[in-house]
Amino acid sequence: MKYKLVAFWLVVFGALFAFLQTRFEYHFYYIEQSQLFLFTEAYIRNKLLLPGGFSMLVAEFLVQFFIRPYVGALVTAALLTGVGVCTAGIVKRIAPVSGLFILYVLPMLALLFMHFDFNYRVQGTVCYLMMMALLCGYMRIRNDLFRLVAGCVLVPVLFWLAGSIAVLFAGMVCLFEGLRKTPKWYISL
């Protein structure tokens, strides 16, 4: 089963890469020229002082390479595949026996369509991937008390790293704890 999932995600990544490279190659060049990444200490420090500044730096760092052939499609396909893998981990944690592969791909498709907009920034996908990865890790914690404490710590950390996506993370944590009927789940509110 593990090899089946790896093969599935490799096929998804390859299909995304091929689609993006053949149909939207010049889109990535345009996106790169509309953003600027300065590799100076002052610029990085000023960005890191802002909530969500870390994700902004990561996104701008990745976008600067979109000028190179194939890199824009490669980075975008990798980010979207990462979102799909995290979604699969979350769905398997909630409903372990479901084999709904299409459910894993739906958030990827929504983000893919948003990437077609010239005004959409890669930072949104980076933030969403960070939130999904933390949520997937959060759901793997077995001890109820440790999980609730981790949730209370992760929300402000995620807000500092990725910005307002932390509100979605907090809502998903409350929903997860409420549906699991964790004793004193309301503490997560």
Describe each PLM feature range.
Residues 14, 67-68, 80-84, 89, ...:
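Eukaryotic intrinsically disordered, low-complexity segments enriched for acidic and Ser/Thr/Pro residues
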Residues 17-79:
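Membrane-interface coil-to-helix junctions
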Residues 30-33, 48-52, 72, 76, ...:
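Membrane-interface micro-motifs in multi-pass membrane enzymes
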Residues 77-94, 133-137:
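Transmembrane-helix motifs of polytopic, lipid-linked glycan transferases
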